Amino acid sequence: MYCYQCEQTAQGVACVTVGLCGKTAEVAALQDLLIEAAKGLSQYAYRLRQLGIALPEIDAFVLDALFTTVTNVSFDPARLEEQLREAACLRDQLRARYDAACAARHTSPETLSGPALWQPASTRAGLVGTGEAASIAHRLTAQGADLTGLQDLLLYGVKGMAAYACHARILGQTDESVAAFVHEVLTTLAEVPADAEALLGLVLRCGTVSLTVLDLLDRANTGAYGDPQPTPVLMGHRAGKAILVSGHDLKDLAVLLEQTVGLGVDIYTHGEMLPAHGYPELKKYPHLVGHYGGAWQRQRSEFAAFPGPILMTTNCIQNPTAAYRDRLFTCGLVAHPEATALSGRNFAPLIASALAAPGFAEDGPVRHHLAGFGHKAVLGVAPQIIDAVKAGAIRRFVLIGGCDGHESARSYFDDLAGSLPQDAVVLTLGCGKFRVIDHDMGTIAGLPRLLDMGQCNDAYSAIKVAQALAEAFGVGVNDLPLSLVLSWFEQKAVTVLLALLALGVRNIRLGPNLPAFITPPVLKVLVDRFGIMPVGTVAEDLAAMGLAA
């Protein structure tokens, strides 16, 4: 095992015996092999596309495979084994399709190598052995940390892109260019000798395609559920039966809301599902009552205390405790051997569990958080914002968002939010919002000082707002009174970062620690070209932003 794809990786280097996320060496090896299997599929899919043959079912499988390997998505070796065996069958079908397509065009098929040729072992232990041979550790030995790190920066950007593309596809939105790029990247990683400049070029292209994906998902979410509207959200509970929904998938929540109409079961969001309350087609359900708990890393205590079942959608699942594992349900790609997997969005077992559970005995304390500041909501008050900036009432915008996590160093983001002067407006998104939303920031020029823009993918909203303000002021985005302070944890944050770099956004602060896979020479390139910097102390960073007391 050698895994360094998330921010909390052991010793800031790599997890080598068990993941700090909780995944075992067995699961890590199967995930490494699933990446290799996806590369093998892409080797054929890439060439078939060059012949004018697109295969949406292969696109979907490869994107799902990549999403499966994102941090805290799948801990289930049995599910991973199923995916691997399906990948081998699909690869054989693709080989036959490719050979037939070449024959029909009277051309000779290329002789492929590497992942295109892998054969699944007959046992799970054999698959694990094959996966271990595909470990990052072997590439580090063969080609060194710099080239390996660039390859993995690209791979992790594509993993996050795949996650967002999967969410969009669930809501009926796809884009051919996304799958085409993914197949190109995986084919390159499978076949082409590592070259730093070529890899860096693909990394930057990954950012450009990531913008396409973020736009795609924004259109998918708003097309299905309307444009988010500023909405007060109860941060607590009321008496009654209850289901808690965590993760990111809005369609899972929408279907559950419809299936629980009139049953006397209240639905609560957790973690990054908080922004769901701003969507008109979701908040119309009166039994979408409020938000319970905070960010993903607090789930083991918060789920244990919740008096009903929990539905985990997409990623951010942790190994459950005995206190709630019999109440934990999963759907979609998220998988854990100790949770009950639901298929086809049939939530009847989940609902039955809620009806059998005690629920909340009484109402809790009443506190509200204002969510729903998507780009259309913010741009709807753009004239007020522009006037406030020109009048000097707003001195700076500070985006504090991204992922949250366990480390005590993440208190930096709390402290930064609490130390900002009253003429600074805070934009937030992702589960990093839970580091700032407990601060009472009041208003400025008749507007809330804290604008919650949504989930991590709603970095797209921040981009749209920044572009619109830059146009209104007649300047570039980098000339705006705007500072970006991003907390990262997993691969979707890498995707968002690359999207920002593709727009030419400079001077992004990243923390609490820099990625282990970005070596000093690679970091120097990012610093020289984009001004990326690690977070410092709050006092130092406020001074650099021109916000010192």
Curated annotation (Swiss-Prot):
<feature type="binding site">
    <location>
        <position position="3"/>
    </location>
    <ligand>
        <name>[4Fe-4S] cluster</name>
    </ligand>
</feature>
<feature type="binding site">
    <location>
        <position position="272"/>
    </location>
    <ligand>
        <name>hybrid [4Fe-2O-2S] cluster</name>
    </ligand>
</feature>
<feature type="binding site">
    <location>
        <position position="21"/>
    </location>
    <ligand>
        <name>[4Fe-4S] cluster</name>
    </ligand>
</feature>
<feature type="binding site" description="via persulfide group">
    <location>
        <position position="403"/>
    </location>
    <ligand>
        <name>hybrid [4Fe-2O-2S] cluster</name>
    </ligand>
</feature>
<feature type="binding site">
    <location>
        <position position="492"/>
    </location>
    <ligand>
        <name>hybrid [4Fe-2O-2S] cluster</name>
    </ligand>
</feature>
<dbReference type="GO" id="GO:0005737">
    <property type="term" value="C:cytoplasm"/>
</dbReference>
<feature type="binding site">
    <location>
        <position position="456"/>
    </location>
    <ligand>
        <name>hybrid [4Fe-2O-2S] cluster</name>
    </ligand>
</feature>
<feature type="binding site">
    <location>
        <position position="431"/>
    </location>
    <ligand>
        <name>hybrid [4Fe-2O-2S] cluster</name>
    </ligand>
</feature>
<feature type="modified residue" description="Cysteine persulfide">
    <location>
        <position position="403"/>
    </location>
</feature>
<dbReference type="InterPro" id="IPR010048">
    <property type="entry name" value="Hydroxylam_reduct"/>
</dbReference>
<dbReference type="GO" id="GO:0051539">
    <property type="term" value="F:4 iron, 4 sulfur cluster binding"/>
</dbReference>
<keyword id="KW-0479">Metal-binding</keyword>
<comment type="similarity">
    <text>Belongs to the HCP family.</text>
</comment>
<keyword id="KW-0411">Iron-sulfur</keyword>
<feature type="binding site">
    <location>
        <position position="6"/>
    </location>
    <ligand>
        <name>[4Fe-4S] cluster</name>
    </ligand>
</feature>
<keyword id="KW-0408">Iron</keyword>
<feature type="binding site">
    <location>
        <position position="316"/>
    </location>
    <ligand>
        <name>hybrid [4Fe-2O-2S] cluster</name>
    </ligand>
</feature>
<dbReference type="GO" id="GO:0042542">
    <property type="term" value="P:response to hydrogen peroxide"/>
</dbReference>
<dbReference type="InterPro" id="IPR016100">
    <property type="entry name" value="Prismane_a-bundle"/>
</dbReference>
<dbReference type="GO" id="GO:0004601">
    <property type="term" value="F:peroxidase activity"/>
</dbReference>
<feature type="binding site">
    <location>
        <position position="15"/>
    </location>
    <ligand>
        <name>[4Fe-4S] cluster</name>
    </ligand>
</feature>
<feature type="binding site">
    <location>
        <position position="490"/>
    </location>
    <ligand>
        <name>hybrid [4Fe-2O-2S] cluster</name>
    </ligand>
</feature>
<keyword id="KW-0004">4Fe-4S</keyword>
<keyword id="KW-0963">Cytoplasm</keyword>
<feature type="binding site">
    <location>
        <position position="248"/>
    </location>
    <ligand>
        <name>hybrid [4Fe-2O-2S] cluster</name>
    </ligand>
</feature>
<dbReference type="GO" id="GO:0050418">
    <property type="term" value="F:hydroxylamine reductase activity"/>
</dbReference>
<keyword id="KW-0560">Oxidoreductase</keyword>
<dbReference type="GO" id="GO:0046872">
    <property type="term" value="F:metal ion binding"/>
</dbReference>
<dbReference type="InterPro" id="IPR016099">
    <property type="entry name" value="Prismane-like_a/b-sand"/>
</dbReference>
<dbReference type="InterPro" id="IPR011254">
    <property type="entry name" value="Prismane-like_sf"/>
</dbReference>
<comment type="function">
    <text>Catalyzes the reduction of hydroxylamine to form NH(3) and H(2)O.</text>
</comment>
<protein>
    <recommendedName>
        <fullName>Hydroxylamine reductase</fullName>
        <ecNumber>1.7.99.1</ecNumber>
    </recommendedName>
</protein>
<dbReference type="InterPro" id="IPR004137">
    <property type="entry name" value="HCP/CODH"/>
</dbReference>
<dbReference type="Pfam" id="PF03063">
    <property type="entry name" value="Prismane"/>
</dbReference>
